[in-house]
Amino acid sequence: MAALGEPVRLERDICRAIELLEKLQRSGEVPPQKLQALQRVLQSEFCNAVREVYEHVYETVDISSSPEVRANATAKATVAAFAASEGHSHPRVVELPKTEEGLGFNIMGGKEQNSPIYISRIIPGGIADRHGGLKRGDQLLSVNGVSVEGEHHEKAVELLKAAQGKVKLVVRYTPKVLEEMESRFEKMRSAKRRQQN
């Protein structure tokens, strides 16, 4: 566990666990196939993604703040890590460079539309497309450590525009919800067109 004021770094703990697994394998006290399976999990990209999400969520809190705020950040980081362990639609951290050409994606949704904020389009040849980390259908959870869950569309746009140098996004892939949103918006547009005619 990190001391007060230290950032949480789980990578060291995971490496130590792998070392201990290797010692156990050499001892022959535990069936090797179980130890090897656990070692594969700890060394997997998935475990690394869960660790990154946990650390990112934990780091969004001011360490010098009250114990209650730190406990809340730890709880949120734990929930994010458990959500990631579900395997499907787990949160991911995506970093994109911010240049004059923009970020190369569009968003839709927001509190005013009673929906989460989603990546609705990846612009072909743009930064997001070249980077490859974002997908159409990703729900935008935070921008540079600021949550956009339950926020207005404009707040997310402002955070993305204000970012300098690079943008750190936490996203979760949920394409079905985006499809439902787009279908709902299309029905609303069709109803409006019928009213105008």
Curated annotation (Swiss-Prot):
It is a peripheral membrane protein. Residues 93-175 form the PDZ domain. Residues 10-65 form the L27 domain. The keyword Cell membrane applies. PROSITE patterns: L27, PDZ. Transmembrane segments: none annotated. GO terms for cellular component: basolateral plasma membrane; cell-cell junction; MPP7-DLG1-LIN7 complex; presynapse; synapse. It comes from the Eukaryota. The keyword Cell membrane applies. GO terms for molecular function: protein-macromolecule adaptor activity. Keywords: Cell junction, Cell membrane, Exocytosis, Membrane, Protein transport, Transport. It is found in: Cell membrane; Cell junction. Gene3D superfamilies: 2.30.42.10, L27 domain. InterPro entries: L27_C (IPR014775), L27_dom (IPR004172), L27_dom_sf (IPR036892), LIN7 (IPR017365), MAM_complex_regulator (IPR051109), PDZ (IPR001478), PDZ_sf (IPR036034). Plays a role in establishing and maintaining the asymmetric distribution of channels and receptors at the plasma membrane of polarized cells. Forms membrane-associated multiprotein complexes that may regulate delivery and recycling of proteins to the correct membrane domains. The tripartite complex composed of LIN7 (LIN7A, LIN7B or LIN7C), CASK and APBA1 associates with the motor protein KIF17 to transport vesicles containing N-methyl-D-aspartate (NMDA) receptor subunit NR2B along microtubules. The L27 domain mediates interaction with CASK and is involved in the formation of multimeric complexes and the association of LIN7 to membranes. Belongs to the lin-7 family. Component of the brain-specific heterotrimeric complex (LIN-10-LIN-2-LIN-7 complex) composed of at least APBA1, CASK, and LIN7, which associates with the motor protein KIF17 to transport vesicles along microtubules. This is Protein lin-7 homolog C. It comes from Gallus gallus (Chicken). The gene is LIN7C.
